[in-house]
Swiss-Prot record:
GO biological process, one term: menaquinone biosynthetic process
Highest taxon in the source lineage: Bacteria
Gene3D superfamilies for this protein: Vaccinia Virus protein VP39
Organism: Haemophilus ducreyi (strain 35000HP / ATCC 700724)
Name this polypeptide is given: Ubiquinone/menaquinone biosynthesis C-methyltransferase UbiE
Length: 259
């Protein structure tokens, strides 16, 4: 009887996951996250600038500097959304290289495609609607995979990391730019106040959707801490994994290699 009860509890745990602070069935989370990004896609870039005071551009510049991407290489911009990374990598890899902007959300992908075309970024970029857990690419395809502020929204992060590992070429690297845990308590307290009191209000005013930005704050708190994500990447097969705390750990950049 005890064994049966334990087995039932384990099965239920395996079938559920977090959507912010809520516990939901795994098959529900993907649609719930999709609804969030369908809602915010049109003003996603504006909200990034407002909520980070433009600092997200510095975080992204540092990520590009750490990527080691060169002319002629192939880059996967996963959960690439509105295409900030794709625009930069397109110029770096040049005509002989290729960038794939992949996102599971059709609204985000459409905004990204329109934005890059308006900027004249064409020719070496492909757009693919794809689930990070089941990437539709052959083994050993990319020199670099970048996922920026997307991993925390993935239902099965371990499966997604293994999928990223699979599509990387030997010698390739994965970069994960994501919100993390502040390393100083005073900053953590201020950040918590900002996240739960300011973010939803700004979202309500600008996007008319406070709930999506409340989810943003909650999803950050549920995301693995720096050392936990490092361990997850190592379990997925990545080697020489390290991370950099940016803005006192509000954001962290993890980097790992496939050898």
């Amino acid at each position: 009887m005890i064994k049966d009860t334990q087995s039932t509890a384990e099965n239920q745990a395996n079938e559920t996951t977090h959507f912010g602070f809520k516990t939901v069935a795994k098959e529900e989370k993907q649609q719930l996250v999709a609804n969030v990004f369908h809602s915010v896609a049109a003003k996603y870039d504006l909200m990034n600038d407002l909520l980070s005071f433009g600092i997200h551009r510095i975080w992204k510049r540092f990520t590009i500097d750490c990527s080691g991407v060169r002319k002629g290489q192939k880059v996967l911009d996963l959960a690439g959304g509105t295409g900030d990374f794709s625009a930069k990598f397109s110029r770096i890899v040049g005509e002989t290289g290729q960038v794939v902007l992949a996102d599971i959300n059709s609204s985000m992908l459409e905004v990204g495609r329109d934005k890059l075309r308006n900027l004249g970024v064409v020719g070496n970029i492909n757009y693919v609607q794809a689930n990070a857990e089941h990437l539709p690419f052959a083994d050993n395809t990319f020199d670099c995979v970048v996922i920026s502020f997307g991993l925390r929204n993935v239902t099965d992060k371990d499966k997604a990391l293994k999928s990223m590992y699979r599509v990387l070429k030997p010698g390739g690297r994965l970069l994960v730019l994501e919100f993390s845990k502040p390393i100083f308590d005073p900053i953590s307290q201020l950040y918590n106040f900002y996240s739960f009191n300011i973010l939803p209000k700004v979202g309500g005013i600008v996007v008319n959707d406070a709930e999506s930005y409340r989810y943003l704050a909650e999803s950050i708190r549920m995301h693995p801490k720096q050392d936990e994500l490092k361990t997850m990447m190592e379990h997925a097969g990545f080697e020489s994994v390290n991370y950099y705390n940016l803005s006192a750990g509000i954001v962290a950049l993890h980097r790992g290699y496939k050898f």
